[in-house]
A protein has these predicted regions:
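Intrinsically disordered, low-complexity proline/glycine-rich segments
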Residues: 1-84
Length: 84
């Protein structure tokens, strides 16, 4: 699942701050893992806290919430990195 060449973010995917995606509340399964949406949580070891995903909202939506894609940001500014 991609938008403009960017792969969807799934539970367990990493961030450029060394963190990872903790939750993925959509019912969409991409290559065996749930896809993450706006508001799903990440953990940032640099900031030592959990932060919500804040996608740009230009891609597909699930029940009104935008999916997160490679390069989207978290509330602390970390970039999401897809494993797809």
């Amino acid at each position: 699942m991609k938008h403009e060449g960017r792969g969807v973010i799934r539970v367990g995917d990493k961030t450029d701050h060394g963190g990872k995606v903790l939750t993925a509340t959509s019912t969409t399964i991409a290559m065996g893992k749930a896809a993450a949406l706006k508001g799903d949580m990440t953990y940032c070891p640099q900031c030592k806290a959990a932060f919500a995903i804040q996608p740009d909202g230009k891609g597909a939506k699930h029940q009104g919430k935008p999916y997160a894609y490679d390069g989207d940001l978290t509330e602390c500014g970390a970039k999401l990195i897809t494993s797809l």
